[in-house]
């Protein structure tokens, strides 16, 4: 990464972490992806079952492979043999020990913004798993809550629609059409502004570009 861009991440990143701590998130700043992987492993007890939503960041980090190598019990919907088994695994994930996810956007004052189609990912954030570990690159951090919501709707959602080949307006044009299509992946827009169960939600901010 360009040295100047790296400074643009490393200087404000810890301030956003401090803002998150005031909202009762257990938050950390890692300058590199490698550091973030080690921090995530440190936060996940070996006795936990671990699952995740459809999350590019975790894939990019190679964290799933590390968890498998370390002998964790994984609830992986991608191993399902048919749609019924996939649904069963997704329900099982809602009561796992640790749920891994990223965030579509984050405001500088520490609020997490997530858009979801089926709702399983935001459901896990709100309630169910013993803890949630959110890993997000600094490219997801925006100035205000409104900025973060705009990023989630106008950048993350269209990019994910194209990633999954979904024929919504944003999937076809690259721009949000504020649709209510049957295939809409923006059914739920959730702002997590506080962790009521203190430190249940853990956030690792990474000084690199990760995810969409």
Q: Residue locations for each model-derived region?
A:
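Conserved short-loop catalytic and cofactor-binding motifs
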Residues: 4, 24, 136
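N-terminal active-site beta-alpha-beta segment that forms phosphate/nucleotide-binding
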Residues: 9-90, 95-100
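Conserved phosphate- and dinucleotide-binding cores of soluble alpha/beta proteins
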Residues: 94-212
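Glycine- and acidic-residue-enriched helix-capping/strand-helix junction motifs
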Residues: 1-9
């Amino acid at each position: 990464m360009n040295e100047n861009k790296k400074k643009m991440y490393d200087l404000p990143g810890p301030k956003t972490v401090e803002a998150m701590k005031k909202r009762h998130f257990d938050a950390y700043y890692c300058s590199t992806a490698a550091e973030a992987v080690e921090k995530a492993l440190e936060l996940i007890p070996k006795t936990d079952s671990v699952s995740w939503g459809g999350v590019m960041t975790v894939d990019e980090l190679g964290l799933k492979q590390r968890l498998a190598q370390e002998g964790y019990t994984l609830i992986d919907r991608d191993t399902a043999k048919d749609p019924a088994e996939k649904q069963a695994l997704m329900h099982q994930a809602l009561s796992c020990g640790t749920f891994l996810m990223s965030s579509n956007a984050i405001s500088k004052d520490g609020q997490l913004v997530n858009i979801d189609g089926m709702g399983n990912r935001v459901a896990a954030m709100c309630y169910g798993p013993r803890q949630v570990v959110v890993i997000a690159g600094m490219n997801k951090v925006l100035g205000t809550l409104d900025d973060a919501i705009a990023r989630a709707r106008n950048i993350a959602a269209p990019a994910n629609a194209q990633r999954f080949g979904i024929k919504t307006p944003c999937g076809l044009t690259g721009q949000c059409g504020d649709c209510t299509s049957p295939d809409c992946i923006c059914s739920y827009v959730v702002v997590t502004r506080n962790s009521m169960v203190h430190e249940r939600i853990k956030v690792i901010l990474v000084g690199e570009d990760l995810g969409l």
